[in-house]
């Protein structure tokens, strides 16, 4: 599990990249899922940073509940999370998990006395089936989440990067 200090650290993107490098070097199959909370910047601007941080923490907790102890959820930006799922080799399994994660995010939650309904878009890439180089994996997942967001709220897109040779 994670603590509030770990979650709300000064540079979550650096921690995220460090974990991605470590996972790539370790080898083995895993899924990288980038979860982007739809419209979160607007929500954050409306409610202020303290409430937005509590919202992010609650969403991260919900995501973590869906994973095993060998998997990881990290904040990768404002309203963005990276999820590493160890042993995930099949696109169908990754897609099924992503749908469950979206359903979990969409459940109403109350923070600081206000009820929120959020949605998320998810981009997925698999390693080592696609690319074992962390920057390429991140690029693939970024492109996939961008494609998901173009489809509208609550969508999933899977990287179409060519298989690793």
Predicted regions and their residues:
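Conserved long alpha-helical elements within nucleotide-processing catalytic cores of c-di-GMP signaling
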Residues: 2-31, 38-64, 74-78, 82, ...
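Conserved catalytic/ATP-binding subdomain
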Residues: 14, 132-135
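A structural signal for short, well-ordered beta-strand segments
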Residues: 32, 81, 120-124
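Core hydrophobic beta-sheet residues of small sensory/regulatory alpha/beta domains
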Residues: 32-34, 158
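Residue-level recognition of strand-loop junctions within catalytic nucleotide-signaling folds
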Residues: 45, 84-89, 106, 127-128
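Short catalytic/binding micro-motifs of nucleotide second-messenger systems
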Residues: 65-70, 103-115, 147
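Cyclic nucleotide signaling catalytic output domains
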Residues: 73, 100, 114-115, 121-129, ...
